[in-house]
Every structure is written in structure tokens, then in C-alpha cells.
């Protein structure tokens, strides 16, 4: 692992005002996708750490895709969902009154346990890194500068994101970027955050 490039992009969204804290999820039904991966592990961990038994105190209605969660919200079959960006912003544009109730990255950080909610890393083969240390260092410096530029220039970055087909429309990309937690964390800070996160999992 060369760097952490994305912190949490997961949010609890709600069509209503019931959910103001993790505790408010008790007794609720949450539609979600990502069973057996980061969304499930993060949600179960945060519920447990907030005194909520994920198997008894909430109902998690697992869907196969995030778009199914958005459809359930849009049809009124669900009022609370776990969604990643950019699905959150897309859903908010389609569903009047849908709000980001909880930022799971912020909720994770409140636990102050030395770990961080990580959803993306940059990896490389050890033999390539060892054979090309200068190129790897240059790449990481350029990557860090790129991250800094994107975070400081959302409108310009959104144009490029749309141009390269990452997100279809630049206005949506511009709305999404502030909530994507794009970072470039390397060295000992990366090791601490990553090892803490992996221990939690």
C-alpha cells in the first residue's frame, strides 16, 4: 500500500428528520447495498460501538445494488438508507426532502480509536516499488498535488471528471466532490490509520 486515497464516502440518508445521531437508528429499517464488504462492516461496527445490536436493534434490508436503495427511497418503500457518494447526491437530486442525516466518516472519527474509515488505497507490487523508488516518489508527489488541486478547485475538477466519464454531468460531480473525502495519506500516518482500520475489521 502506497497511500490512502479515499476516506469514508458512506452516509446515512433519510427522507425525514428522525435520524440525528447513531442512537436514532435503533428500531429503524435501513436499506443498504454492499453486504459482505466495507458498507456492511462499517455500519455494523458503528452500530455496535454506539450500543446498538445490528442483528436485533435494527433491520438492515440488503439490496444487490445502490441503485435499488435509491429506488426504494424514491418509491417510499424506505425512508432511511446507507449510500455512498455519488449515489447520495444523485438521490438527493431525484428525491425531494432527502437529506444526509449522518456522515459515517464523522461518526467513525468520534470514536477516537486511532483508526479511520478508509474506502480506497493505492497499491503497487513490492518488486516494482523497490526497482523504481524515484518513479514511485514522483508519482506520490504528483498524486498529492492532484488531490490538493481537486479539493481546492471543485468546479474545474468537475469538468474533467465529466470529460473523462467518471461522473456523467459536471454539475453533479461538483456537488459530490466535497463529500468524497479524497486524500493522499502516506508514511506513518497511513500505516497508523490503515492498521487501526484493519484491526477494527
Language-model regions, residue ranges each:
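Short, glycine-/small- and polar/acidic-enriched structural segments
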Residues: 1-55, 60-62, 79, 85, ...
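Well-formed, non-transmembrane alpha-helical positions, independent of function
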Residues: 24, 71-72, 90, 176, ...
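Pocket-lining segment of extracytoplasmic ligand-binding domains
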Residues: 67-160
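A broad structural signal for alpha-helix termini and local helix breaks/kinks
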Residues: 50-51, 95, 165-166
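Extracytoplasmic/periplasmic, Sec-exported soluble proteins
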Residues: 4, 17, 31-39, 61, ...
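Predominant activation on well-ordered alpha-helical scaffold segments within soluble catalytic domains
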Residues: 44, 89, 195-199
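Secondary-structure end/capping motifs
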Residues: 129-200
